[in-house]
Structure formats: structure tokens, C-alpha cells
């Protein structure tokens, strides 16, 4: 962990897969499909002093290969949610942006597939996973901090 202001300024650089060249400097890396609260959780963790990055999980190719190495130091946590809840969140997001176009982003079958694929990737890499469906950002962050502390004992 580091000072809050330093962690907070770093978190903005490392959101949504930006600046993946220095992921090794992170304490925690969050992975998840779109709208699984990666960014707000990262910001919350940064305010607690944890250097946090997040990577959107589009498919297995969207993951930097070096983080799948067993000796990769940062704590990696997968975030998942129920497909139906994700469908509602994404639909509301598009409505708030005044976009009502139906796309794969809001196709329930595609979302179910996306969520299942993310779970398979998390299992394959033995990354701890948190279901954020009915959790607040604070509850999710508390679980992540516990995982981080266990990993770094």
C-alpha cells in the first residue's frame, strides 16, 4: 500500500485497461466484464491507500498474458455478477446516454455468455472471484482487502 493521494492519482491512469505496461506496480488488479463496478471499487481502494488497476474483460485475449503467470506479484481478483442484473444495469446505462439501440451489450443471451466466460477465465487462472450482484462498493472492497491480506501473509 502507499499514500492515499499517490494511490488515488495512479488509479485514474490504470482504469479500463489503460497503462497496462506497469501493472506490476499495482497492489490489486480487478478484472470483470463491463459494468461490474471495477472503476468505483478501484477508486474506493485507492482512497484506502491500495494501488489498484482494472482491466475490462472482453475475452481471454484482452488479458495481458504476463498476469496469468503464477509468479505475478499483484493480487488479482475477478468481479462477476448475475446476468439479469447486468442486463438491467447496461440497459439503464444506455438509456441515460440516450442510446436505445439494441446491441450485444444489452443482449441477455450474450451477457449470460460473457459472464460464464469470465467465470471460466477466473477458474482457469485460479483467481479469487467476488459476485458483486447485491454488494455495495464498500462491501466488495472489504472482501478484496481480505483477499489481498491473505495473499500477502
Task: Name what the model sees in each region.
Residues 1-8, 12:
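Single conserved hydrophobic/aromatic residue that forms the stacking wall/gate
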Residues 13-21:
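A short, basic/flexible loop-to-alpha-helix module at the beginning of a structural domain
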Residues 14-15, 99-140:
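Small-molecule kinase domains that catalyze NTP-dependent phosphoryl transfer to phosphate-bearing small molecules
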Residues 20-24, 68-71:
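Solvent-exposed alpha-helices and their adjacent loops that cap or buttress functional pockets
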Residues 52-63:
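Short beta-strand-centered segment that lines the nucleotide-binding/catalytic pocket of NTP-utilizing
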Residues 53-55, 75-79, 128-130:
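Hydrophobic/aromatic beta-strand patches that form the interior of the parallel beta-sheet core
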Residues 74-113:
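A glycine- and Lys/Arg-enriched "phosphate-lid" helix/loop adjacent to the NTP-binding pocket
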